[in-house]
Amino acid sequence: MTTFQAIFLGILQGLGEFLPISSSAHLIIFPWLFGWKEHSLVFDVALHLGTLLAVLVYFWKDYLDIVVQGIAKPKSEKGKLFWFIIVATIPGALFGYLFENIVEEVFRKQYLLIAIVLAVFGFILYYVDSIAKNKIELSKMNVFQAALIGVSQAFALFPGISRSGITMTTGLLLGLKKEAAAKFSFLMSAPIILGAGAVSLLKNINHVSAEFSNFAIGFFTSAVVGFLAIHFLLGIVKKSGFKIFAYYRFFLAAVILAFYLLRAV
């Protein structure tokens, strides 16, 4: 892997982890489009740990308040949010533990299938953004809503769905304001990224030193770009909603289809 490839993939991860466009789909599709070799599991760990750092740094004050209040005052506004995040994390973590390897094997080189998923979820995102009645603030959400958002996160294993996309969309369907749906999606991302990243890192810890340069580049790039992506999305949803990301999904699906057909000839 070249330095340029490490930076480019770090940018894709930083954007795709927090924007509703699917980081996993981008990390599969773009190396295929450019004819690059598959990146290693160690590098994949670096990318995810980078985005973990991004969300922890961006929301560090929120996380500090949430953890302290969750332990000291569990019935307070921030205290409830602590337990809501835990409730929302369990379904995705369980589903990932049981089925992640199976899903990865099925979707590994199914580029046309990924294009279809990107487009279909693009339509869903567009439709929900158009019809959802967004009135509920983050402080007014309940444990039932948190649980449903957590269950929806399980579907993010499928490349093209997007963890942030499916959780934000579910939040919108449940009546959360767009900013609230986005913020809860970001806040609940840390435990799932931390868990998955820690497990993968422990499995591949012996290979880190051999790939340290690319590991560091991918980590740093995804962290910086991820931080900027969070800021960008929180700003744009207030003005334009999520439709712009649906349009991008349609465009990328069309590009994948075109390349797939050209290479099949």
From Swiss-Prot:
It catalyses: di-trans,octa-cis-undecaprenyl diphosphate + H2O = di-trans,octa-cis-undecaprenyl phosphate + phosphate + H(+). One of its GO terms (cellular component) is plasma membrane. Keywords: Antibiotic resistance, Cell membrane, Cell shape, Cell wall biogenesis/degradation, Hydrolase, Membrane, Peptidoglycan synthesis, Transmembrane, Transmembrane helix. It is found in: Cell membrane. The chain crosses the membrane at residues 14-34, 40-60, 79-99, 112-132, 141-161, 182-202, 217-237, 242-262. GO terms for molecular function: undecaprenyl-diphosphatase activity. Its EC number is 3.6.1.27. Catalyzes the dephosphorylation of undecaprenyl diphosphate (UPP). Confers resistance to bacitracin. Belongs to the UppP family. This is Undecaprenyl-diphosphatase. It comes from Caldicellulosiruptor bescii (strain ATCC BAA-1888 / DSM 6725 / KCTC 15123 / Z-1320) (Anaerocellum thermophilum). The gene is uppP.
